[in-house]
Amino acid sequence: MKRNKLLRGIVVVGIAALVGCVAQVQAQERDAELALLRGAAEDGDSAAQFTLANHYYRGLGVQQDYDKALALYGKAADQGLAAAENRLGMIYERGLGMPQSYGRAMTFYRKAAVQGNALAQYNLGMLYETGKGGRLDYSQALDWFRKAAEQDEPDAEEEVGYFFQRGFLGARDYEKAREWYKRAAEHGCSNAQNQLGYMAQLGLGVEQDYVQALDWYYKAAAQGNPNAQENIGYLYQHGMGVEADYIQAETWYYKAAGQGNSNAENQLGYMNQYGLGIPPDLAQALAWYRMAADQGNKTAIENLKALSERLQGVDAEMWQAASVDAKQAVEAQAARRVRIANLQRQIVDLEMDARLEESLAESGTAAAAPVMGALKLRKEADNYRAEAARLRAELAGLDVLAASSAPAQ
């Protein structure tokens, strides 16, 4: 028995030592790769400057440092690297490490877009569509979206479909909208998948089909799309295409509300107020209505006003207690929402960076930058996707934690 224990102890120690050695080797490899990147960047290699900037921008293997990232992106952009120009546009649009400037964002997006960078073309189109660049121009927006869509940029394909669905530049054309949505959906765009579900649910250009709608919503929800999650909740709440199930409805609403979907927040308020599938909880109802109302949801504003007046008129003490509980619930949900939003943005950006590195590998940039080379650029892309996968696991953990702390069914 003692001998077996001794052997087990030796095995455990051996495994621990092996794991430690592997980690040490991996750390040494990362340090060597970073040293190589720094050297190449100092020698003026634009691909290396861009890649090293990504490390500082994300804090991957180095201390996060926006100033160093911006300086390196700037050097790469000065050499005409479209990927760096697009990234500078994003940084100015978001105001990361510097004052927000839509004008400068548009300038950098345009520089990259005229070089054929699909992401920049899409981003430039969004500034025209929203008017954030100083001028609302649907014609310019659609023109840039089409250019990006011709390069199979999924979000741009979805936007082209949206223009046809809404009729921004003429009559609505549901058939063309569906064509573009399907193309984007096949490329993994969750917004397009959700829109296809919406069109099937309402029968826009197709025969109304709740089952097909639910199928598309599930595809989009699997990617974390909050609008699709809210739509699934609605179908379960009202028994459309499925048997009515309040517990399923609340589960999906809760997922969507965690990402700030105001319709889902309002629906959770309604379900808590009237005890649909759960015990009535007026404090929770107030909290959810308030969160949705703070985002300008008109139905929630009306519901919040009506419930507040009812409680104040019936029992002032109950109203006070419910208000305190609601305030605490709002604060907790707001903190969770910020964390979720940050994780999702990082995941999207990492996936985008992976595509940019692959694009550099496939272009002439890799041939002109022998220190980086196509293989190293593709390895960087793999590293970004691995980090995105880690963040997805963390995001999934937040869902599990939220489910365990949600009100009892």
Go through the PLM ranges and name each one:
Residues 51-58, 72, 87-94, 123-130, ...:
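Hydrophobic face of amphipathic alpha-helices that form TPR/SEL1-like repeat modules
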Residues 377-406:
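Amphipathic alpha-helical coiled-coil segments
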Residues 2-11:
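Bacterial N-terminal signal peptides that target proteins for export
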Residues 28-35, 63-72, 99-111, 135-147, ...:
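Structural signature of tandem alpha-helical TPR/SEL1-like repeats
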Residues 10-20:
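Bacterial N-terminal signal peptides
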Residues 55, 76, 91, 112, ...:
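TPR/TPR-like alpha-solenoid repeats
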